[in-house]
Amino acid sequence: MSEQATWTHPAAQQQSSNIAGDGIFASEDLPAGTIVARLHGRIVDDVTLRGLLADAAAEGGYVDTIMIDDDQNLVLAPDQLIHFCNHGCDPSLWHLDATTICTRRAVAANDELTIDYATQTTHADFEMTCNCGSELCRGTVSGVDWMDPDWQARYEDHVVPAVRRAIQRWGTA
């Protein structure tokens, strides 16, 4: 994939969020299954990603990335609207495939569009405090949430391929 911009649905708009900073909100009703984003960026391996993350941390910056496959991470181009997509433990978005994100259910105008960050990584060192406020809030989001059978049932195949394979391997261990 090239360093081209990520496409986002025209109804996705940046606004102030109660979850964290700014978020992405629907400016109109979106039916379930509506494609909201097609991610583009630069694919890097895990070693390169760790270097990018360390450099960004040292400079007070941020690297927007998702794990799309084993040892393949998509680093999104800077200044993309999708950067403002906050985590939610009962999200309105999920993956159709590694780089396509759609609505998980019908979304009303003015609702925040969120995605479960744990559907995008198996990196065991990933962990963050959650502020989503949903009834399903886990309090902490991590790169090992995929090990929870209830979590697996909720998302089924709507995760990146690396998470899907980790679940399959774990289930046969």
Region annotations inferred by a language model:
Residues S2-L93:
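Catalytic cores of histone-lysine modification enzymes
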Residues C89-A173:
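C-terminal SET catalytic tail plus cysteine-rich post-SET Zn-binding segment of SAM-dependent SET-domain
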